[in-house]
Structures are given as C-alpha cells and as structure tokens.
A protein has these predicted regions:
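Active-site helical microenvironments for divalent-metal-assisted chemistry
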Residues: 2-212
C-alpha cells in the first residue's frame, strides 16, 4: 500500500543522530555552571530550558555539536563571559564555541542597556551562519512557549518579568521571527512563527503583521 504524506507536513530527519560521552559531559558542564539559576520568576531549574532547546535542535535534525551548543548557549552570557567561551572551546571544540558565541548577546557584566543589546544581536543574527541560526531559533521558540504558558496562567503581569516590558518583548520576538523566516523555513522557524502569532493574539494583536 502506497504511503500518503500530507502536504506541508514537517518531516523528521531520517539521519541517525548519535549522542556520546561529549554530550553527557556538556550536560554536566551546563548543570554545574547554571546550578542555582532558575527561569524568570519561577522555581524551575534553568537547566530545563537548556534541555528543551537541545531537544528542539535534535528534533530539527541537528547533530551532536549543535545539541551541545544548545545546552551551552547561555553559559557565556550568564556564567563567566569571555573566559568561559575559551573554556567551552577547550572542552568542546571550535564549532561548538562558535555557535555559543553566536547565541550570546553580551559577554560582559553589567550587560549593556536592553534595547541597544537586542538591536545589536538582531544585526548580528542576520549575518550569522546556519548552525547559529538553528540553535538561536530553538532558544527563542522555547522562550516564547514559556511566555505563552505564563501568560495563560497570570495574564498581563507576565510582562513585568522582562526588561523590555510588553512592547519591547513583543517587538523583539516579532523581529526575530522575521529574521529567521527570511533565512529559512524549517521545523523550528515554522513553530516559532505560530508561537509568536499566538502570543500576538493573546496580547492584543500585532499592528505590523499586515495579515500575517
């Protein structure tokens, strides 16, 4: 019997992805360095976000290097800055370090002002390579899904958790959505588009969507 594939149905990669001791070491490294950190205004261990991003990357066909980069994508920004990037490169290689660096919007403390930092990151992301875009898009998808969940639970007060407030946060994720979609439509970017669309609907609409 001939198998029927639905039009536009996302297809999982058929390539077998092997995760070995390096991935386990990366998980331990991430758990150690993010120990005590939690998601915004919650008791959820931060490692849950990193695991979620790595899962999305693997589901989209990313290899072990990209899954490791997903686990470590915040370790420079939140756990040590530029010296930490050198440690990532030493332990996990140049490709992983390049993606982690590409997903970092600040490697100094205190961080630069929010708006300027996000605008700079968006400019950087437009020219980033495909590996970085994949991991970054997975990160943003996981973030938007978390915002959606929290919005359903507590409503408009969710925006007080973010430096950009309501308007800044919505602007940031709308802009990122557009950057990713201009580059490629894949499993993650399609899901990000839908998640941002849902967030816009809950928050009162996107005046710049033009019917998106």
């Amino acid at each position: 019997m001939k198998k029927v594939v639905k039009k536009n149905q996302p297809q999982r990669t058929q390539r077998k992805i092997s995760l070995g001791p390096r991935f386990l070491r990366a998980f331990e490294f991430a758990a150690k360095n993010h120990k005590g950190q939690t998601r915004k205004a919650s008791t959820i261990p931060y490692i849950a976000h990193l695991m979620g991003v790595a899962s999305l990357v693997l589901e989209a066909g990313g290899d072990e290097d990209l899954a490791i980069a997903a686990l470590l994508h915040d370790v420079v920004e939140d756990c040590g800055g530029a010296p930490m990037l050198k440690e990532v490169r030493r332990r996990f290689g140049a490709r992983v370090a390049k993606v982690v660096e590409g997903c970092t919007d600040a490697d100094t403390f205190p961080k630069p002002p929010w708006q300027a930092r996000k605008e700079k990151y968006i400019r950087h992301l437009k020219a980033a390579d495909a590996d970085t875009k994949l991991v970054s898009a997975a990160d943003k998808l996981n973030n938007v899904r978390s915002i959606l969940s929290d919005y359903r639970a507590i409503g408009e007060s969710v925006w007080s958790r973010f430096n950009g407030g309501r308007e800044g946060t919505l602007w940031y994720y709308r802009t990122l959505r557009d950057v990713f979609l201009r580059h490629e439509r894949n499993r993650i970017t399609r899901e990000l588009e839908l998640a941002v669309q849902e967030l816009d609907a809950l928050a009162g609409g996107d005046p710049t969507s033009n019917g998106r």
